[in-house]
């Protein structure tokens, strides 16, 4: 499965709205266009026309990833996904996995902490450990659907990307290339170790001062 940026946005929106606003699902072309162009919870923010969304829908229909539905007495065509968890889908995911994949389709690479914070309307993760466990399962499938990106400089957590879209594959390849192209040399490593040691000493000093202050107040 390989999705364009527009196709990934359409699938992500259908997954999202199926969970967050089930009373409005399936979505009309107009509602889907509005969802694709939301200013919040989207990265990148897009400005798609209805014609562009329709093109993406037509392409997804050929890939058998969406289906059309029209209500009795209504001429408005509505769309629902066949991306996962339907009788026509090869991909079967838990609600937790759907939430993670949906967020990655809509907002690009994210850390487990970001995924937990942003998933409250899609799935109730108890903590980051639960997010990490779900990510691990998705990466260990026979056909992995997520990939871990190299840790960015100055960041504590690694980001993860979905493997359904062309953009995600390019990000993954570029990140690993960048990481391989700029390894730490010996001088950089020594400077980094010295800086870490200095910070550890400062933390220890502050802890001693705090302990002394607490003792004087007790």
From Swiss-Prot:
Domain of life from the UniProt record: Bacteria
InterPro entries, per the entry: DUF480, WH-like_DNA-bd_sf, WH_DNA-bd_sf
Family annotation (SUPFAM superfamilies): Winged helix' DNA-binding domain
Pfam families per the UniProt record, alphabetical: DUF480
Family: Belongs to the UPF0502 family.
PANTHER family named among the record's database cross-references: UPF0502 PROTEIN YCEH
Protein name stated in the entry: UPF0502 protein Shewana3_1622
Protein's organism: Shewanella sp. (strain ANA-3)
């Amino acid at each position: 499965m390989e999705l364009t940026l527009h196709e990934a946005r359409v699938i992500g929106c259908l997954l999202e709205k199926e969970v967050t606003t089930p009373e409005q699902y399936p979505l009309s072309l107009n509602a889907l266009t509005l969802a694709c162009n939301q200013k919040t919870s989207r990265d990148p923010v897009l400005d798609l026309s209805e014609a562009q969304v329709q093109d993406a829908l037509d392409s997804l229909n050929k890939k058998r990833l969406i289906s059309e539905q029209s209500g009795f007495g209504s001429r408005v065509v509505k769309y629902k996904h066949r991306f996962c968890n339907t009788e026509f889908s090869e991909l079967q995911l838990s609600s937790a996995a759907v939430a993670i994949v949906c967020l990655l389709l809509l907002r690009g690479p994210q850390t487990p902490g970001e995924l937990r914070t942003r998933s409250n309307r899609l799935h109730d993760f108890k903590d980051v450990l639960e997010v990490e466990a779900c990510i691990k399962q998705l990466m260990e499938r026979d056909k992995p659907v997520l990939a871990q990106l190299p840790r960015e400089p100055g960041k504590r957590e690694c980001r993860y990307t979905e493997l359904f879209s062309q953009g995600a594959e390019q990000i993954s390849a570029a990140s690993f290339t960048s990481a391989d192209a700029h390894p730490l040399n010996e001088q950089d490593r020594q400077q980094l170790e010295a800086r870490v040691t200095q910070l550890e000493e400062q933390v220890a000093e502050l802890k001693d001062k705090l302990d002394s202050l607490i003792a004087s107040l007790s």
